UniProtKB/Swiss-Prot annotation:
Disulfide bonds: none annotated. The keyword Iron does not apply. InterPro entries: Ribosomal_uL6-like (IPR000702), Ribosomal_uL6-like_a/b-dom_sf (IPR036789), Ribosomal_uL6_a/b-dom (IPR020040), Ribosomal_uL6_bac-type (IPR019906). Keywords: Ribonucleoprotein, Ribosomal protein, RNA-binding, rRNA-binding. Part of the 50S ribosomal subunit. This protein binds to the 23S rRNA, and is important in its secondary structure. It is located near the subunit interface in the base of the L7/L12 stalk, and near the tRNA binding site of the peptidyltransferase center. It comes from the Bacteria. One of its GO terms (biological process) is cytoplasmic translation. It comes from Dehalococcoides mccartyi (strain ATCC BAA-2266 / KCTC 15142 / 195). Coiled coil: none annotated. The gene is rplF. Belongs to the universal ribosomal protein uL6 family. This is Large ribosomal subunit protein uL6. The keyword RNA-binding applies. GO terms for molecular function: rRNA binding; structural constituent of ribosome.
Length: 182
């Protein structure tokens, strides 16, 4: 049994949860999220708590048990507080500029790269080297941050590129000039 899945989820004040079979709708101050869960799990309400339980003891039910509990918890946290992912741009001349809802990246290519956020995602620029991705759906926020990072991944020789805030990039040593070099 999943240790994470066994823990009940507390529903905070200001958040309403509507359960209809495997369809769950969570409404809060930041917005509304809806998800259809797998038939291998059941979700029930017990006072101010939500309880996720597997249907049966087969491998599929056990594997979706903890996942479903975490997804439901992320929905509740998202509509209450929201999620943020911060990115940093490292490198001489590399920058990001805001243009309406879009962000224009100048990251060492011969052209600029324009990123338009999908619905429900907000992009903001702090200074010219910090980008913040925010929204209520953790999966969409993380996916958007990963797409932005993939524009110019950090270089392992110089460390230049777009990285997550606090991400450690291991710098490789360059070519060593040895004894036989002429």
């Amino acid at each position: 049994m999943s240790r994470i899945g066994k823990m009940p989820i507390k529903v905070p004040p200001g958040v309403t949860v509507d359960i209809k079979g495997n369809d769950v709708t969570v409404k809060g101050p930041k917005g509304t999220l809806n998800r259809t869960f797998r038939p291998e799990v059941t979700i029930t309400r017990d006072g101010d708590y939500l309880v996720v339980a597997p249907v049966g003891t087969d491998k599929a039910a056990r594997s979706f048990f903890g996942l479903s509990r975490t997804l439901l918890d992320n929905m509740i946290v998202g509509v209450k507080d929201g999620f943020d992912k911060n990115l940093e741009i490292v490198g001489v001349g590399m920058r990001a500029d805001k243009d309406g809802n879009n962000i224009i990246f100048k990251v060492g290519y011969s052209h600029t790269v324009t990123v338009a956020p999908p619905a429900g995602i907000t992009l903001s620029v702090d200074g010219t080297t910090k980008v913040k991705v925010s929204g209520i759906n953790k999966e969409e926020v993380s996916q958007m941050a990963a797409e932005i990072r993939s524009i110019r991944k950090p270089d392992h020789y110089m460390g230049k590129g777009i990285r997550y805030a606090g991400e450690y990039v291991r710098i490789k040593p360059g070519k060593a000039i040895g004894k036989g070099a002429k």
